[in-house]
Amino acid sequence: WAFVLALLPVLSAAQVVDPNADPVRISGALGGTLSGYQMNGINARQQPLGYSLSGTLNISVYGWTLPFSVAISRQGSTFSQPFTRFGVSPEYKWVKLHAGHRNLRFSEFTLNNVTFLGGGVELRPKAFRFSAMYGMLQQAQRADENRYGVAQYKRMGYGALLGLGRKNTFDLTFFRAADDVSSLPLLDTLQRITPQASTTLGLRSRVQFAKDRLVLDADLAVGAYTHDLNAPRLDEDIYADRPIVGELGFNYASNLAGAGAVGLDYVKDKFTSGVQYRMVQPGFRTLGANYLLSDVEQITLRTAFPLAKDKLQLSGQFGVQRNNLSDRRFAGTARNIGSANVAYRPSTRVSVNLNYANFSIYQTLLLDTLFADSVLIDQVNHQVIVATLYQYGDAKRQHSWSLMTGYQQLSDRSDGPTDLGNRLINLNLQYQLRWLASRWGLVLGANYNDYSALLTTNERYGATVGATRMLKKDKLLLRLTHTWNRSQLPDRMDDIHSTHFSMNYRLSDRHALMLSAGNIRREGLQAFTETRGTVGYRMRF
């Protein structure tokens, strides 16, 4: 924050004010909903009453832009207090500041859109880039304060990005986060949780060459992850010649690993083709990402191009993935992933899309010498989806037919007495009719699903009917739908009826009202009736 405050006078001195511009402009939006809920027959899945409030406020002062946002809601049955977040990111020319609950992204392997409560700055003058942040990534919570009954430590983090270039870019990133060991009482630390820390240094680059037909993308990182800050520290003689190890507080629960993704693409007119190599070593982790799969290596080939004067679009990719890079797992897994997509649109009335995907997984036992190289899993999953659309009409009526079909087959080729595979078939047909003068609309639909496996089958079919009407010079939209589905299992049959009504009324250019109500009734085993209703209002200023 000292850096930000020191920067403000410089920015103010460099500011050029347009005397004809409004010195202050304010705009934004405010909305809220109130919902009711009732369940009969089984346990309720949410509270009887709920609410949500959200708002945005944009203030412009002599070119400075200050956007504010806030959200408050109450949902679920185990929250003891409302959920509230607030953040602001004022911006002026190439300067952007952050305060409150914010998200920043440096790279995939350092800081990747994790939410923090704190402050930050982004500077982007011409081809130069600088970003920095500091804040709390998670607050301390005792086990009895958390809806999942699991305690968590207070976690603080900071990071920076330094980059150059526009067409060809080079970014150096750094991020560190650590849990506060003293943020939980001793009783909660007895759970199977440990204070963690991570330090990651990354390099990201994008370079175009060969008359911009070749594009090289690289995202590389090396990081140290400690899964228990309470573990014994390393002896000084171990890192005597590597002082950085001591500065970062490495201990016997620390691990040093790398990660990266490098891709090369060839682009000419509308044809693209490329290859990407990706590897995340075992033990690599950054606390700046919500989720990152480690111990994986993958190579992917991809291509896309049009034919028949752009009426036919073809694309596809094929990849090979494996884990157990250090041969320390009990079993190793390899996957082959392939997909192809064909999109054909001969006219504005007709379109056909075909997608095929093939996923195979192969797992072998590695460490047990008695069963070395024996196959544990050998499965292939085929999936085909075909979607067609046909539209026609005149000045009075518009018709639309859509049909989506899907087929999925899982084949189990593992060593064993039986095939554990399964099959799934989906069919969805929908017809829409619109009367342009009266603003009426009609929707008819039918669906069919058939699932079969070794020990069970499930056949489901149903129909949908709905109507829409536009009133008040298209300011009021009314919609009513009813859906019926029947599910047939070997030992029982269930019927589900679902009715939904909604109204959206645009009172003016700045005000809108929303109302919705729905009812779900299940007949058969575990019969129940569920009713929901919501009213909402939104305004712009």
Segments (PLM) and residue ranges:
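Glycine-centered structural positions embedded in regular secondary structure
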Residues: 24-30, 135, 157-159, 171, ...
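Outer-membrane beta-barrel translocator/receptor signature
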Residues: 46-53, 61-66, 78-84, 93-94, ...
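Exposed, low-structure sequence patches enriched in small/polar residues
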Residues: 46-54, 81, 162-164, 168-176, ...
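Outer membrane beta-barrel
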Residues: 71-137, 266-273, 279-283
